[in-house]
């Protein structure tokens, strides 16, 4: 879990646009966040396996 200060810092509009970054809305992780879901890869996988993300299913080929 990310520190609350870092989560609040990410919400602010930065002085320069390139400094903006996404954080996972569930755990606050800053790396590997899927913009479409707003979740990091770990939370995305957990919720997909539980069936809590509509339209997401496990790939098999």
Swiss-Prot record:
GO terms for molecular function: rRNA binding; structural constituent of ribosome; zinc ion binding. Gene3D superfamilies: 30s Ribosomal Protein S14, Chain N (4.10.830.10). SUPFAM superfamilies: Glucocorticoid receptor-like (DNA-binding domain). Binds 1 zinc ion per subunit. Zn(2+) binds at residues 24, 27, 40, 43. The keyword Ribonucleoprotein applies. Binds 16S rRNA, required for the assembly of 30S particles and may also be responsible for determining the conformation of the 16S rRNA at the A site. Part of the 30S ribosomal subunit. Contacts proteins S3 and S10. Belongs to the universal ribosomal protein uS14 family. Zinc-binding uS14 subfamily. This is Small ribosomal subunit protein uS14. It comes from Thermus aquaticus.
């Amino acid at each position: 879990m990310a520190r609350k200060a870092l989560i609040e810092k990410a919400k602010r509009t930065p002085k320069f646009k390139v400094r903006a970054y996404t954080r996972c809305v569930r755990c606050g992780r800053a790396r590997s966040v899927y913009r479409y879901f707003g979740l990091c890869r770990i939370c995305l996988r957990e919720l997909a396996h539980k069936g809590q993300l509509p339209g997401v299913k496990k790939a098999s080929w």
